[in-house]
């Protein structure tokens, strides 16, 4: 991918919103990325926000401003405000909670249909892959009907275990790559 600093200015921070149903593991992902260790969390009432300079992978050194928005039903109407004008969306899914995948799908499709979010790169983190009975990535992709998202939405499904950090670096690298491609595409459209 070349020199990262030529792709994103050192002074620029990517705006990333983390969404998903309650108990999917969003806050665990956030603090694993920030501290590179497990931090015991409590349900998010409202949101958490952190500026994090990524420390691993292709996106190493890139500064990101993360917004981790609570996933309880009463907080979901706020998702639209927090996801407006974002560089990327991370949608965390509990790979074991099969009973709530339909609900996760409905909420994800709502978010990606907001006019402001059309075409925004999407990283789906299939969390809790370390647990027995976790669904494989292909099944999660199918259950979430990702193929039905608008064609402009690029996405990647990343198997992960937020508690130990497995898969998070790879997922962030993929999200960063999708953000760069989108920016390049938007820049080319402006030139026309």
From Swiss-Prot:
Gene Ontology CC entries for this record: cytoplasm; cytosol; filopodium; mitochondrion; nucleus; plasma membrane
InterPro entries tied to this protein: P-loop_NTPase, Small_GTP-bd, Small_GTPase_ARF, Small_GTPase_ARF/SAR
Family the entry assigns: Belongs to the small GTPase superfamily. Arf family.
Quaternary organization: Interacts with CYTH2. Interacts with alpha tubulin; interaction is independent on the ARL4C GTP or GDP binding status.
GO biological process, one term: endocytic recycling
Free-text function comment from the UniProt entry: Small GTP-binding protein which cycles between an inactive GDP-bound and an active GTP-bound form, and the rate of cycling is regulated by guanine nucleotide exchange factors (GEF) and GTPase-activating proteins (GAP). GTP-binding protein that does not act as an allosteric activator of the cholera toxin catalytic subunit. May be involved in transport between a perinuclear compartment and the plasma membrane, apparently linked to the ABCA1-mediated cholesterol secretion pathway. Recruits CYTH1, CYTH2, CYTH3 and CYTH4 to the plasma membrane in the GDP-bound form.
Lineage: Eukaryota, Metazoa, Chordata, Craniata, Vertebrata
UniProt cross-references to Pfam families, sorted A to Z: Arf
Lipid-linked residues (N-myristoyl glycine): 2
Localization in the cell: Cell projection, Filopodium; Cell membrane; Cytoplasm
Keywords for this protein: Cell membrane, Cell projection, Cytoplasm, GTP-binding, Lipoprotein, Membrane, Myristate, Nucleotide-binding, Transport
Binding sites annotated in the UniProt record for GTP: 20-27, 68-72, 127-130
Superkingdom assignment: Eukaryota
Tissues where this protein is expressed: Expressed in several tumor cell lines (at protein level). Expressed in lung, brain, leukocytes and placenta.
Listed result of changing residue 27 to N: Does not interact with alpha tubulin
Induction of its expression: By liver X-receptor/retinoid X receptor agonists or cholesterol loading.
Annotated CDD domains: Arl4_Arl7
UniProt xrefs under Gene3D superfamilies: P-loop containing nucleotide triphosphate hydrolases (3.40.50.300)
GO terms of molecular function: alpha-tubulin binding; GTP binding; GTPase activity
Protein's recorded name: ADP-ribosylation factor-like protein 4C
NCBIfam families with a match to the protein in the record: small_GTP
Coarse class of the protein's main subcellular location: other
């Amino acid at each position: 991918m070349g020199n990262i600093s030529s792709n994103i200015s050192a002074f620029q921070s990517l705006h990333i919103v983390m969404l998903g149903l309650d108990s999917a593991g969003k806050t665990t992902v956030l603090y694993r990325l920030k501290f590179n260790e497990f931090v015991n969390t409590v349900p998010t009432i409202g949101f958490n926000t952190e500026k994090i300079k990524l420390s691993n992978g292709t996106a190493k050194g890139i500064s990101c401003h993360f917004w981790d928005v609570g996933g309880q039903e009463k907080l979901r109407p706020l998702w639209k405000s927090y996801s407006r004008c974002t560089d990327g969306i991370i949608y965390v899914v509990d790979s074991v909670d099969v009973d709530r995948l339909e609900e996760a799908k409905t909420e994800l499709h709502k978010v990606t249909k907001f006019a402001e979010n059309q075409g925004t790169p999407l990283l789906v983190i299939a969390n809790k892959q370390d647990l027995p009975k976790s669904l494989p990535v292909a099944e999660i992709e199918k259950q979430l009907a990702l193929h039905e998202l608008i064609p402009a939405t690029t996405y990647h499904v990343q198997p992960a275990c937020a508690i130990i950090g497995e898969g998070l670096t790879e997922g962030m690298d993929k999200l960063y790559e999708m953000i760069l491609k989108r920016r390049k595409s938007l820049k080319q459209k402006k030139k026309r």
